[in-house]
């Protein structure tokens, strides 16, 4: 629905605060959403926001994997990944995840030899990727995103918001191509908004 429904300004406001009391959850599917809600409702002394669509989306993870995803905040999706990747494709959010999985499928069809790692990020804080209880360390960040491979990151927010969070890590910015919301478009579908942006 364009700017009125897809404006990520609230996400930006939370994640740009200099604080250590807020989490923003970006569940990739219904199972992850349920686990996120469980985490949010059991937490105290922190602000939690959940960013999720209102339509039925693919179910990517079992309940067990959803719990692991939410606990760690980011995870390599082995079922959509290859060993020793040439490129890392990351997603944060339900629609961005669906789009990233479709992109991987297209690449695998057109270029079967391409080795891709699929990474999903389900939560962010001002301090980094993950939750307040489990912010990804530099070591974990490097293990997941590699030291030198290019990363295409599909984000459900302003690209600059994610760039400011990545600043917490020793990252060469030329490796990361962050795709997100740019306020271009009108009342339309999420896919069309992403194409326009």
Regions found by a protein language model. Name each.
Residues 1, 25-28:
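Active-site nucleophile and cofactor-binding loops and adjacent substrate-binding regions
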Residues 1-12, 19, 36, 40-197:
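Thiamine diphosphate
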Residues 21-23:
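Inter-helical turn/loop segments and adjacent helix faces that build the functional surface
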Residues 28-32, 95:
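Short beta->alpha linker loops
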């Amino acid at each position: 629905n364009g700017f009125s429904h897809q404006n990520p300004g609230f996400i930006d406001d939370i994640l740009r605060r200099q604080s250590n009391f807020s989490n923003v959850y970006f569940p990739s599917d219904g199972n992850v959403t349920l686990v996120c809600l469980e985490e949010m409702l059991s937490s105290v002394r922190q602000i939690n926001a959940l960013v999720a669509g209102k339509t039925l989306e693919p179910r990517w993870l079992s309940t067990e994997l959803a719990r692991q995803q939410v606990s760690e905040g980011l995870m390599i999706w082995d079922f959509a990944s290859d060993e020793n990747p040439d490129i890392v494709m990351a997603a944060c959010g339900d629609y961005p995840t669906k789009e990233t999985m479709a992109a991987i499928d297209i690449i695998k069809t057109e270029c079967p030899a391409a080795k891709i790692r699929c990474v999903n990020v389900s939560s962010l804080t001002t301090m980094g990727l993950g939750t307040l209880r489990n912010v990804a360390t530099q070591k974990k960040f490097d293990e997941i995103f590699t030291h030198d491979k290019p990363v295409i990151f599909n984000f459900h927010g302003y690209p600059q918001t994610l760039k400011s969070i990545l600043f917490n890590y020793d990252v060469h910015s030329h490796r990361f191509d962050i795709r997100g919301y740019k306020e271009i478009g009108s009342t339309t579908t999420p896919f069309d908004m992403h194409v326009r942006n």
